[in-house]
């Protein structure tokens, strides 16, 4: 019998629980606020986690933002219901908590601030005065946890309908449909729901007009083809000029983070595919890497290269759709049909390897579902010989077109400061001249072993620059795939680890303890050690991350999913004010988003 597993149980785990006291920022905080001003939490997140007092939040945030090498981006902000958490040794007493994840580009380091809250006092000052992109994150945290952010400019629901009762991510809120009463939609309730969707400008701080004229308010979406999904944006117009606008999201919200609390660590993998439904295996990568940190698993070299290969195939697939639909939004129809021919070749290859097309659910904790099939290298070779010429034809026929350039150059332009303020990542950030791609800056899954370049813009991110960067990213992904083809390691496709992989059959037939453990792992799911882990990756649309909290159970205590599209849609008003409606259509096409990635 061929052994397709490697025994890693006796090796030193790659991820140790660390407090990161050696990180320079801890010393800087202690020098400024005193050695006893906060509690440092040891985790497997890979970043310092610091509990601070609520009264210090704004002062600490301002201090970090003004350091010589500042923490310039609020990467994520959300909450947690701590009431049922049993493993909290050494942490401040808390019924709920709010965390703030900050990034320093200059240091290439992060810090996570946490604030403990009592159930009878769920108040914390708004962070919007320091980071404008805290707006949506605070609205979502209030919506799903009921935590109030004092001073927030418009604290209202964002994911759930305005008529919703309760806060779904609380532990006392039902997680299964069978725990609810049967759904009924009466005429009165339908009228109430429709009334709640009526846009009232005063609720958003907008005026209906000036002394001399009235503004027009236009609904774009939630079913407009240029909205790229179930997404509404309300425009305040002075003629064709956009005075202001309000993006309205949540129509595609499926409770993905709540589902993480009721699925085993293994059975949640198919849900990750559907967060950004064009990304396929790219979505699975941060989740399985975060779980592997919790378990202390190091995967074989072959697994790393296979994962990179599948991720880059899906990156090309997503970028082709993005580029062709952008061209279509500007007014040219033909390229989108050419792109679907190319994408079909990728799907044929993906299906041959994984058995599925869009949502493979193929990565596994500790490896992949099965080894590469015979002939995979021939299919990949054929695609690599085909694609470069096609890419050149897209660029020559459409992207160098004078009309397309005129419609997109200088439109929805912003610089590095604005990109960082709004949490922009991916091509939108790199177009401003900031060279930050997680595959290079913080390599994962063996990306450090590949030779490829990161395309960077000249200082201003506009619609055309963002698209052309993705064209170059396609070429770099082809370089990576060429190296995967020529340097695929031999060896197993999964780690022999008791938390993830069933044992060989002969072992279960000889050792009763092995059989019992196998039975429990399959029926209940693996029990991950109580800890916290975090993993970010360079996804197709920007940085995607999973922040997992284990309470020593078969299921995640808290699954936080940070997606790039959410931040990018929040930036729309700041980037498009003063432009025309036709410019907005081009801008929406240049963002590269799908609403499942926004709403989760």
UniProtKB/Swiss-Prot annotation:
Could you state one GO cellular component term attached to this entry? NADH dehydrogenase complex
Q: How does it sit in the membrane?
A: Peripheral membrane protein
Give the quaternary structure: NDH-1 is composed of 13 different subunits. Subunits NuoB, CD, E, F, and G constitute the peripheral sector of the complex.
Q: Pfam families this protein is in?
A: Complex1_30kDa, Complex1_49kDa
Return the Gene3D superfamilies for the record: Cytochrome-c3 Hydrogenase, chain B, NADH:ubiquinone oxidoreductase, 30kDa subunit
What reaction is this protein's catalytic activity?
Answer: a quinone + NADH + 5 H(+)(in) = a quinol + NAD(+) + 4 H(+)(out)
Q: Which UniProt keywords apply?
A: Cell inner membrane, Cell membrane, Membrane, Multifunctional enzyme, NAD, Quinone, Translocase, Transport, Ubiquinone
- State which Enzyme Commission number(s) the record gives: 7.1.1.-
* Annotated region described as NADH dehydrogenase I subunit D, given as residue ranges: 214-600
InterPro entries (alphabetical): NADH_DH_suC, NADH_DH_suCD, NADH_Q_OxRdtase_suD, NADH_quin_OxRdtase_su_C/D-like, NADH_UbQ_OxRdtase_30kDa_su, NADH_UbQ_OxRdtase_49kDa_CS, NADH_UbQ_OxRdtase_CS, NDH1_su_D/H
Name the UniProt record assigns to this protein:
NADH-quinone oxidoreductase subunit C/D
Chief place of localization: membrane
Q: Which family does it belong to?
A: In the N-terminal section; belongs to the complex I 30 kDa subunit family.
Q: Which organism is it from?
A: Escherichia coli O157:H7
Q: Which is one GO molecular function term here?
A: NADH dehydrogenase (ubiquinone) activity
Q: Give its localization.
A: Cell inner membrane
Chain spans, region NADH dehydrogenase I subunit C: 1-190
The protein's role, per its UniProt record: NDH-1 shuttles electrons from NADH, via FMN and iron-sulfur (Fe-S) centers, to quinones in the respiratory chain. The immediate electron acceptor for the enzyme in this species is believed to be ubiquinone. Couples the redox reaction to proton translocation (for every two electrons transferred, four hydrogen ions are translocated across the cytoplasmic membrane), and thus conserves the redox energy in a proton gradient.
